[in-house]
Amino acid sequence: MKRVITLFAVLLMGWSVNAWSFACKTANGTAIPIGGGSANVYVNLAPVVNVGQNLVVDLSTQIFCHNDYPETITDYVTLQRGSAYGGVLSNFSGTVKYSGSSYPFPTTSETPRVVYNSRTDKPWPVALYLTPVSSAGGVAIKAGSLIAVLILRQTNNYNSDDFQFVWNIYANNDVVVPTGGCDVSARDVTVTLPDYPGSVPIPLTVYCAKSQNLGYYLSGTTADAGNSIFTNTASFSPAQGVGVQLTRNGTIIPANNTVSLGAVGTSAVSLGLTANYARTGGQVTAGNVQSIIGVTFVYQ
């Protein structure tokens, strides 16, 4: 009887190993073993401006899976479910590309199966995209923000195994995702004016994935009735009687006055801005000058 029990135990062990044949890991080595589970995936976000969608993250470079027994078992893998974008992206819809086909995101149904039949780690073919909205601005994402929760479902042709591999996708870096079809050369530009009464060009350009009419307007606290001289906000030894004024091709630009750039395409277009000193009234005294001026883009 003892020999029978031992033989049965060995046979049971062999059946368990061969039936559970699928496991996954992340690019940094975090694993979800045979039988499923959950893991966090920290991804570096590098958005780009594309026509119709802006890439948020390509998970095919981050998640890999394999089949331990391809001779006897074929594993089938789907994207069973994908959550809405988390945090600051929760109000935006998008798409998910799975094995070359695009689906709504958040997902509305399970995707078709992808076959895993090799011991070699194979990328999980998932990429998330954000659908543009009617703004040329962007959404700031902080490192550590939850981007999405994706559920990989694994079945096979051997038995009734049905396992879930849950991937919590987090941003690994601070980034601004452009939510429109256009983007700018820099989101924070600092220029240094020479001594009074000097001026300096502002190196700011904009480009779009496809040609569209674009404009912009300036915003900030102004010190004059014409809303064109921005207040000196220097906190240390500020100059008196002077502020900052922006011009375009020699023409003064008041705050909240839309400037048309015309058709903007894939080639960067300069905003043509120059920063200048401007008198606000009263006696001018020496000191520091600083102004913070916002630029907002609009589709026309």
Curated annotation (Swiss-Prot):
The keyword DNA damage does not apply. It is found in: Fimbrium. GO terms for biological process: cell adhesion; cell adhesion involved in single-species biofilm formation; cell-substrate adhesion; mechanosensory behavior. Its main location: other. GO terms for cellular component: host cell membrane; pilus; pilus tip. The gene is fimH. Keywords: Fimbrium, Signal. PANTHER family: FIMBRIAL SUBUNIT ELFA-RELATED (PTHR33420), TYPE 1 FIMBRIN D-MANNOSE SPECIFIC ADHESIN (PTHR33420:SF14). Belongs to the fimbrial protein family. One of its GO terms (molecular function) is D-mannose binding. Residues 1-21 form the signal peptide. InterPro entries: Adhesion_dom_fimbrial, Adhesion_dom_fimbrial_sf, Adhesion_dom_sf, Bact_Fimbrial_Adh_Pro, FimH_man-bd. The keyword NADP does not apply. Involved in regulation of length and mediation of adhesion of type 1 fimbriae (but not necessary for the production of fimbriae). Adhesin responsible for the binding to D-mannose. It is laterally positioned at intervals in the structure of the type 1 fimbriae. In order to integrate FimH in the fimbriae FimF and FimG are needed. This is Type 1 fimbrin D-mannose specific adhesin.
